[in-house]
């Protein structure tokens, strides 16, 4: 008997983003369904055979998806809302993509950031609501269920893919999203209705799927219930027991490997170990301490899947150190009761480090992407089965890399540590309370009531993207690129003056991305060429890799600000990304607490804020688009996170005089549960997304008696639609019913980078007119 290895899921997009390009060609009508399905099949085949060749015994199938695995599950159980016009039978591609992206043929709205949950497809039949998958930057489509919902098995995808792999000689372990998590992720429009109440109706379909898999020859099936990493009620735990009792009964032929990830089981551990399943997966990266408890609490026959390799990050593991922990477990439990695995699906990591030819070799040896993580598992299994000596060279290389990383001067900058140690509480406080600052700012800025502004970026046109690409490839010179960007900036500034905006922006034409742009100028960040990770559907992001102590060698935005301000007498906002957002949209160090890394970034941003002020900026905006999405999965951990997140923002923002106005921006609208933290950030002005909620979400601010100024977005930039003046005056009136007039700003709900100029111009002209009318009324 030997220790085997499993992966819980592998990236779907392809090493060269083949799936993305196939999807987009299909959506654009350039290729047909066969071409798309061929690419998908080819990717699956390569993924299976590659994992099998690397020594994975439990190769997953049905982890592939054309768009999203939660959507696949909804389709599998026939949960297709009436709006999509489905009349039973197999769900065709048109219906599937309508659920994913809204109306056919309509281009997906682009997100404003990797974690932005803005659903594509603005008009026509809307897409299902898209939201973040637990605490990742992956977005799933929330199933929409209604009271009395009927379920029926309407897809043979799990069985088809199992057979497809079997035909290639790979015996897979199919993956299903578990019924309880599926229902917990679902949304409903019916008030007071809980989708979990549909469990009894749903279970028979799962029973059918499991029997189908058994008939096709599957022995193990992986069933994912990551809801076990959340706070659950006693009722929910009881429902899990009921569900797995029923499923074991319905399909006695298959052995279930129950997984949860993104954290420990915590309070749910006793429930999990006692479910009538044959295997249980533990996320030992996020919850290393749960191993002992699980060993002690579980019956001897339960197979434990030990998630020891980090599926959420890019660091190479220290294999000898892991073996020190694993060897006693194997000795105690028996090799046939232990499976080695990544902590979660590898969906959240880039695919292959071998594609990175430009990475600094020193940094590169510290990294492992999906393929390298599987290789590491193979080394671990070999060492456990054949002794450490049988893989001595691989173990030594791993230990060597770990030692090098622990001591590298590239990572450890004593000056950063000293500076951090010298941070005093007054550095996180503005000099005076808001009321006093407001007066100082009023005197300095002299703005009209309901001042108008935008969130920062203007359209990233084809020309802008082409110029950037040409510059990156060395096809155009520094000077040519710079001249081009200056011209774009000058045009944007002149246009803003003409339409009568009160507070201007330079337009962010020089920025590739709101995090990458800063990461590239800060010490401590590295970037990949092919390190793509799926964000949703065909959209992928390449998160920066935060590998070392962060500092700011030189000013990052000051020259652009100076240039832009030199073109106008109106105030030009300095435009920065905040420390929490930079942190949350990067791969972060695993050798330093997140909060320490965040404070380091905060100090670097603070330097920039202070320099902008010294250069003359009267208004500086520090975007924290990703503050909310960093919230931990369990409520009990929220306060600690919010404390250091807010403190980091304040550290970045508080180095300026009272008369300098600090803005922040957040791309979402759910503030109810974090309003105290928003208040504690102590920004002078916050702009938020509200356009789609008819200003109702302002109630959170009203209830909190939020003292400072707010720019509730008066129109949705995620759609090309140009809002009429009246629409925005109505929204402004609704806002004024809730807040004092002098608290309000007028702005769109996010940056305009994904829009085109004609609609942007028309919308802003209307917005300025709406503000004028509102002032007069
Ligand atoms: N200043 C950024 C922009 O306008 C903010 C983007 C965001 O919040 N996602 O593009
Ligand atoms: Zn935004």
UniProtKB/Swiss-Prot annotation:
Keywords: Amino-acid biosynthesis, Metal-binding, Methionine biosynthesis, Methyltransferase, Repeat, Transferase, Zinc. It catalyses: 5-methyltetrahydropteroyltri-L-glutamate + L-homocysteine = tetrahydropteroyltri-L-glutamate + L-methionine. L-methionine binds at residues 455-457, 508, 623. Coiled coil: none annotated. Binds 1 zinc ion per subunit. Pathway: Amino-acid biosynthesis; L-methionine biosynthesis via de novo pathway; L-methionine from L-homocysteine (MetE route): step 1/1. It comes from the Bacteria. Zn(2+) binds at residues 665, 667, 689, 750. Its EC number is 2.1.1.14. The active site is at 718 (proton donor). One of its GO terms (molecular function) is 5-methyltetrahydropteroyltriglutamate-homocysteine S-methyltransferase activity. Pfam families: Meth_synt_1, Meth_synt_2. InterPro entries: Cbl-indep_Met_Synth_N (IPR013215), Cobalamin-indep_Met_synthase (IPR006276), Met_Synth_C/arc (IPR002629), UROD/MetE-like_sf (IPR038071). NCBIfam families: met_syn_B12ind, PRK05222.1. Belongs to the vitamin-B12 independent methionine synthase family. This is 5-methyltetrahydropteroyltriglutamate--homocysteine methyltransferase. The lineage of its organism: Bacteria, Pseudomonadati, Pseudomonadota, Alphaproteobacteria, Caulobacterales.
């Amino acid at each position: 008997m030997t220790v085997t290895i499993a992966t819980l899921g592998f990236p779907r997009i392809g090493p060269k983003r083949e799936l993305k390009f196939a999807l987009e060609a299909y959506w654009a009508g350039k290729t047909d369904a066969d071409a798309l399905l061929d690419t998908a099949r080819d990717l699956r085949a390569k993924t299976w055979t590659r994992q099998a060749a690397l020594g994975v015994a439990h190769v997953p199938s049905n982890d592939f998806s054309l768009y999203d695995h939660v959507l696949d599950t909804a389709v599998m159980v026939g949960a297709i809302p009436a709006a999509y016009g489905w009349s039973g039978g197999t769900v065709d591609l048109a219906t599937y993509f309508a659920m994913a992206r809204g109306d056919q043929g309509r281009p997906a709205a682009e997100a404003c950031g990797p974690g932005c949950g803005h659903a594509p497809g603005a008009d026509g039949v809307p897409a299902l609501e898209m939201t973040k998958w637990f605490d990742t930057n992956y977005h799933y489509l929330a199933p929409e269920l209604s009271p009395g919902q009927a379920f029926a098995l309407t897809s043979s995808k799990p069985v088809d893919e199992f057979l497809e792999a079997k035909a290639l000689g790979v015996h897979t372990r199919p993956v299903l999203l578990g019924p309880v998590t599926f229902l917990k992720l679902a949304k409903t429009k019916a008030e007071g209705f809980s989708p979990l109440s549909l469990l009894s109706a749903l279970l028979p379909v799962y029973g059918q799927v499991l029997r189908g898999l058994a008939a096709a020859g599957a022995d193990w099936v992986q069933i994912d219930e990551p809801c076990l990493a959340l706070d659950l009620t006693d009722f929910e735990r009881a429902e899990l027991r009921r569900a797995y009792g029923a499923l074991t009964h319905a399909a006695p032929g298959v052995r279930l490997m129950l997984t949860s990830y993104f954290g420990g089981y915590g309070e749910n551990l006793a429930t999990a170990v006692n479910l009538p399943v044959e295997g249980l997966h533990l996320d030992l990266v996020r919850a290393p301490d749960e191993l002992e408890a699980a060993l002690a609490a579980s019956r001897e026959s339960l197979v434990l899947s030990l998630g020891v390799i980090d599926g959420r990050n890019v660091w190479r593991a220290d294999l000898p150190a892991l073996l020190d922990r694993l060897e006693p477990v194997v000795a105690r439990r028996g090799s046939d009761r232990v499976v080695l695995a990544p902590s979660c699906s590898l969906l959240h990591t880039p695919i292959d480090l071998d594609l990175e030819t430009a990475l600094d070799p020193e940094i590169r040896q510290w990294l492992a992407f999906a393929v390298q993580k599987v290789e590491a598992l193979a080394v671990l299994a070999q060492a456990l089965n054949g002794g450490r000596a049988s893989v001595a060279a691989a173990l030594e290389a791993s230990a060597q890399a770990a030692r090098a990383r622990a001591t590298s001067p590239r990572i450890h900058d004593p000056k950063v540590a000293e500076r951090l140690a010298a941070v005093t509480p007054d550095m996180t406080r503005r000099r005076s309370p808001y009321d006093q600052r407001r007066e100082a700012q009023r005197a300095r800025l002299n703005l009209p009531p309901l001042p108008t502004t935008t969130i920062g970026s203007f359209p990233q046109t084809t020309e802008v993207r082409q110029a950037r690409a040409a510059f990156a490839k060395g096809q155009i010179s520094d000077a040519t690129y710079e001249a081009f960007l200056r011209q774009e900036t000058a045009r944007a500034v002149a246009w803003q003056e003409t339409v009568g905006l009160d507070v201007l922006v330079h337009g962010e034409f020089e920025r590739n991305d709101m995090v990458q742009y800063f990461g590239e100028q800060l010490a401590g960040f590295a970037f990949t060429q092919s390190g793509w990770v799926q964000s949703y559907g065909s959209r992928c992001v390449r998160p920066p890799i935060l590998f070392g102590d962060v500092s700011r060698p030189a000013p990052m935005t000051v020259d652009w600000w100076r240039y832009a301000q030199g073109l106008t007498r109106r105030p030009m906002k300095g435009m920065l990304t905040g420390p929490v957002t930079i942190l949350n949209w990067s791969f972060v160090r695993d050798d330093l607490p997140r909060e320490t890394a965040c404070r380091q970034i905060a100090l670097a941003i603070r330097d920039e804020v202070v320099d902008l002020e010294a250069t003359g900026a009267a208004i500086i905006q520090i975007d924290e688009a990703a503050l909310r999405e960093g919230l931990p999965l369990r409520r009990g951990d929220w306060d600690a996170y919010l404390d250091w997140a807010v403190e980091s923002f304040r550290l970045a923002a508080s180095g300026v005089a009272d008369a300098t106005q600090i803005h922040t921006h957040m791309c979402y609208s759910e503030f109810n549960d974090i309003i105290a933290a928003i208040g504690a950030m102590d920004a002078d002005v916050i702009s938020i997304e509200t356009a789609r909620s008819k200003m109702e979400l302002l109630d959170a601010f009203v209830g909190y008696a939020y003292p400072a100024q707010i720019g509730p977005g008066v129109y949705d930039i995620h759609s090309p639609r140009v809002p009429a003046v009246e629409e925005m005056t109505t929204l402004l009136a609704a806002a004024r019913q809730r807040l004092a007039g002098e608290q309000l700003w007028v702005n769109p709900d996010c940056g305009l980078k994904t829009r085109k100029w004609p609609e942007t111009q028309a919308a802003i002209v209307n917005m300025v007119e709406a503000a004028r009318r509102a002032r007069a009324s």
